[in-house]
Amino acid sequence: MNTSIGPYSIALVSDFFCPNAGGVETHIYFLAQCLIDLGHRVVVITHSYGDRKGIRFLSNGLKVYYLPFIVAYNGATLSSIIGSVPWLRKVFLRENVQIIHGHSTFSALAHEALMIGGLMRLHTVFTDHSLFGFADASAILTNTLVLQYSLINVDQIICVSYTSKENTVLRGKLDPSKVSTIPNAIETRLFTPDSQQFHKNPTTVVFLGRLVYRKGADLLCEIIPKVCAQHKTVRFIIGGDGPKRIELEEMREKHKLHERVVMLGMLPHNQVKQVLNQGQIFINTSLTEAFCMSIVEAASCGLHVVSTRVGGIPEVLPVDEFISLEDPVPDDLVEALLKAIEKREKGRLMNPEKKHEAVSKMYNWPDVAERTQIIYQKAVESPSPTRIARLKKYYNQGIGFGILYITVAIIIIFGLAILDFFDSPAKNRKKNQKRSQRHTNTGTNK
């Protein structure tokens, strides 16, 4: 570890974490592990999942707080304004947290933690994993109500691609100097190629993702029949579930493709490699992406990727050898797929083992963690504004939602004052010192 950085006590906060599976969940898990390896103290704060409540230690030693918050929609908690203050304050004090790192625009818990932590004069960092538009109602509400106000008082912001950075700066009207770009990574040891299947299996195209409009499920419905009509032996494997699955089932029925299009449904993450190893080509039809983890996983397994040219995807993999990019137009994607199939059958695709080795060098979690700790250092070194200064920033963003955020901030300030009166931070610090001393003595006796 760079001795000039930290060590810091860090709380990674998001509604999305294990046992749930997804890009944000994976990112937090591996980032936490690598930060611990670098010498930092890390805890994760999320909401309870079924019977998983309270404090849990994962197999890698990571401490996780599963707090009893109400889940409102799609895994995100219902913002309660004052209800989360006692819980988050207690965890921040108990763990001597210096830096709060929130993840995901969609996580109400992350935004609450950033606001409460900021008013406690703790340092704050936010990672935006999403890419939004500017015109539709949901994007306007997210940009105005969440990003413009929630991030105005955050010390440092991380985006997963340069396209995502530009998008976030514009959406949130942020100072570009406090927004950095650090790409995602994958645990390449979990995504290794199977050369025997790659060469012996019939030509197989794999799609893994949620079957929703945003992921281009409508494009899939048009692409598959056209490719199957022009190439009589190609197979498709589709892993994932969602509202568009019915349309894909109808397409398969209409064109009598039951034996050539396999629908796997929802796929546990530990089975992703097994499915990828059955194919040689991976198709991604997303209409918008900040950084597409699935195409990196596919490339790590040795597959050639055919993808839409949207968002931050052109930054992810080298074009031609690793990925073929086309606009999200059915005929263009069909043409790209047919060219990839021709390359596969003539033995002109890159060797899967060499591709895996190259991806391993491009994307690894230790590198992401080292770059992230530099952002933490910037956050710690940046001046922490007073509570009055924070309220002024909300007001300057616009009087409408500004008054709403000022009101919420004042309620939180009063709530913190009452809690500090009955449970002083100094008393908590003494308890933490005694607890640390007890652990040290126990370790010495052993």
What do these predicted ranges mean?
Residues 48, 163, 185:
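Carbohydrate-associated surface elements
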Residues 158, 197-225, 237:
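Conserved donor-binding/catalytic core segment of Leloir-type glycosyltransferases
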Residues 249-267:
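Nucleotide-activated donor-binding/catalytic signature segment of Leloir-type glycosyltransferases, i.e.
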Residues 266-267, 274-279:
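Short alpha-helical donor nucleotide-sugar binding micro-motif in glycosyltransferases
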Residues 287:
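Aromatic "clamp/platform" in nucleotide-sugar-dependent glycosyltransferases that forms part
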Residues 304-307:
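Short hydrophobic beta-strand element within catalytic cores of glycosyltransferases
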Residues 348-405:
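A charged, aromatic-enriched C-terminal amphipathic alpha-helix characteristic of glycosyltransferases
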